[in-house]
Swiss-Prot record:
<dbReference type="GO" id="GO:0016020">
    <property type="term" value="C:membrane"/>
</dbReference>
<dbReference type="GO" id="GO:0016410">
    <property type="term" value="F:N-acyltransferase activity"/>
</dbReference>
<keyword id="KW-0443">Lipid metabolism</keyword>
<dbReference type="GO" id="GO:0009245">
    <property type="term" value="P:lipid A biosynthetic process"/>
</dbReference>
<keyword id="KW-0444">Lipid biosynthesis</keyword>
<dbReference type="InterPro" id="IPR001451">
    <property type="entry name" value="Hexapep"/>
</dbReference>
<dbReference type="GO" id="GO:0043886">
    <property type="term" value="F:structural constituent of carboxysome shell"/>
</dbReference>
<keyword id="KW-0677">Repeat</keyword>
<feature type="active site" description="Proton acceptor">
    <location>
        <position position="248"/>
    </location>
</feature>
<keyword id="KW-0441">Lipid A biosynthesis</keyword>
<protein>
    <recommendedName>
        <fullName>UDP-3-O-acylglucosamine N-acyltransferase</fullName>
        <ecNumber>2.3.1.191</ecNumber>
    </recommendedName>
</protein>
<dbReference type="InterPro" id="IPR007691">
    <property type="entry name" value="LpxD"/>
</dbReference>
<comment type="pathway">
    <text>Bacterial outer membrane biogenesis; LPS lipid A biosynthesis.</text>
</comment>
<dbReference type="Pfam" id="PF00132">
    <property type="entry name" value="Hexapep"/>
</dbReference>
<dbReference type="InterPro" id="IPR020573">
    <property type="entry name" value="UDP_GlcNAc_AcTrfase_non-rep"/>
</dbReference>
<dbReference type="Pfam" id="PF04613">
    <property type="entry name" value="LpxD"/>
</dbReference>
<comment type="subunit">
    <text>Homotrimer.</text>
</comment>
Amino acid sequence: MRWSEFLQHLEAKTGPCTAKAIAGDPELHGVAAINEAQSGQVSFLDQESGLQDWIEQTAASALILPPDPALQARAEARNLPWMTTAQPRLAFAAAIAVFYQPFRPVAGIHPSAVIDPSAQLGDRVSVGAHVVIGANCVIGNDVILHANVVLYPGVSLGDRCQIHANSTIHERSQIGQDCVIHSGAVIGAEGFGFVPTASGWFKMEQSGIVVLEDGVEVGCNSAIDRPAVGETRIGAQTKLDNLVHIGHGCQIGKACAMAAQVGLAGGVEVGDRVILAGQVGVANRVKIGDRAIASSKSGIHGEIEAGAIVSGYPAIPNRQWLKTSAVYNRLPELYRSLRNLIRRVEVLEQDRPSS
C-alpha cells in the first residue's frame, strides 16, 4: 500500500488530516512503535511518549505526528513523509486497523455445538466447537461464538457481538450490539447475596438480570453478577479490563474505563466517563459522579463528586494525597527531629530553677 492510499484509508476512519510527502510515495506494509519501526512501516509520536529524539533515529518510512511545527520540521529534515492530527494516538490506532485484521472465523455451526431447538440464530453466525446455546436464546446477525462458550437459557446477543472461548453468559442476560466478551468472562452469575440467621446463612435467590449496552467490552476472567431483583447494567461503550468484578445491582454509566482488578461491591452507581485505575476498590452502594478518576489502588468508601480525582486508601482528593505522601516519606526524619526536640525540652525543664 502506498503512502497516498494509506492516507485515504486513514481519513475514511478519522476524518481530514494534514499530510506532507517529501520524497515520493513510499510503499507501506505495517505499523510499529517509533523506536522499533523498520523500513516500510508507519509510526507515530505524541507529546506524552517521551520518544521525540527518535525522529532522527527511526527507520520508519512515514510518521504520524502531533500538530507541532518543530517535530514536522525534524521529520522533513530526514525526508520522511508525515501526517498530523490533534489526536495522533487515535490516528495510529486507525492505522493499525488499516493493516491488521483480527481473526474472524467463517460463518457456520461446528458439528459438536449443542443448540436448543427453540434458540433463534441470525444471519452469518459463527458457532465454534462445543458451544452450548440454551433454550429461547436470541442471537443477532454476524455474531461470533468461539469454542466452549455457554449461553444459558433466555440470553440475547445483539448484532456483531463476539464472545471469546470459555466464556459463560447466564440466564436472561441481555447483551447489546457490538459487544466483545473475552475468554473466561462470566456474565450474569448469581450475586453474593446471603442473609445471616441463627443457624448460618440463608441464600437469597438472585432473580435479576445483567444488561450490557451497545459497544461494551469485558476483559478476560472478569465477572458481572446479577442482583436479587432488578438489573446490573453496564452503559454503552464502557470498557472493562481483565479480572474486573462488578457486584450485583451496580449501575455503570457510559464510556467508563476500569483497569485490571477493579472491584465494585453491590449497588455501586458510577456516572459517565469515569476512569478507575488498577486495583481500585469501591464499597457497597457508593456513588461516583461523571468524569471522576480514581488512581491505582484507591479505596473508595464514600461519594465521589463529578470530575473529582482521588487517590489512596481511604480515597481522598489527589492533591491532598500527594502532600500526605510527601510527608509520609519523611516520617523517619520527622520522628528523629521530634525525638531530639523532646529531649532538649526535657533537659531545659530539668535545668530550669524551681519557683
